[in-house]
Amino acid sequence: MKIGIEAQRIFRHKKHGMDFVVLEEIKQLQKIDKRNEYFIFVKPGPDHCIKSSVNCHVIEVKCPSYPLWEQVALPRAAKRCGVELLHCTSNTAPMFCNIPLVLTLHDIIFLEPRGSHNKSLYQNLGRLYRRMVVPQIIEKCRRIITVSHFEEENINNKLCLPPGKVTMIYNGYNEWFSKRNYDANVIGRYIDAPDYFFFLGNTDPKKNTERTLLAYSQYLLKSKVKRRLLVADIKAAEVDAILKRYGMSYIREKIVVAGYIKNSDLPHIYSSAFAFLYTSLRESFGIPLLEAMACGTAVVTSNTSSMPEIAGSNAALVNPEDADSIAMMMLKLETDGDFRSSMIEQGLQRTRLFSWRNTAEQLLGVYASV
């Protein structure tokens, strides 16, 4: 069978969650499947992270905007290649496409109420696009894939889909993520010493950046050690604005804002952290949880949405809407060495349940059933 896979953004330099998911899936399919023929549709970019192989063809499709690329250029390219099944991997798909569709619907956050603060223009436009497209394509899709039981139940309840249309397939994590010895050359690009708290921030309200910074300020008031906080995926000006809004500018000297951290550096960043804070209000899966655990790092995460499902009892669970709950867990990890050690060991064991090979094998089952 000729299978097309939409992977529009994997050639861009700064990749994020869904980009890595489809990239890892493609890599595994290249390894394990020699029967089907694959056409990987990408937008041109600087990072040629996958190459064509005997039965896997990388097709660069040029188009200036995301909607036009997906709605016009992608179905045209798929038709030219004789694709018999098109897998769209990032929540949306062409509305007018005669090729049988499989859609990975990571979440339906775009159908839920907005956060308490406005998102960026880019985020708002993306939300509007998904709200317009998904209802139009959902019935046309032969199968919907999602990434956790939490999200599967959420999708079924809100979209009223027929039984069996949604298939849950867990994500994996890259085995590149493993415990690393301290490397001053790598760590020094971002922070000057190890044993910091590490937090992946964002302006998206679901990432809970404001409340996590509030929790850190409470931690500093009570801690004797007063570890620094390394914040990634957010601009310094945005952190400064939050601190100013809450009258916390005095803690700025303890916060290091790293911006975007290269994926190749992340194993070192996780490994040298005292703990990883993944305190989102809402996640559909949470690959960073597994990455941190695989690097031997204690994880503080939320007791909401998919995070307890993915972490199990192998992370320190907190109420993400309560800054005091987050702060107290940071302090507990600092003052209770046995507890922290148990979280590290249990986290390492938990990661053994997840792999991209398992994900790819289940994908093949979906393709064969359509």
Question: Which positions does each model-derived feature cover?
Answer:
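Carbohydrate transferase catalytic cores enriched for Leloir-type hexosyltransferases
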Residues: 1-370
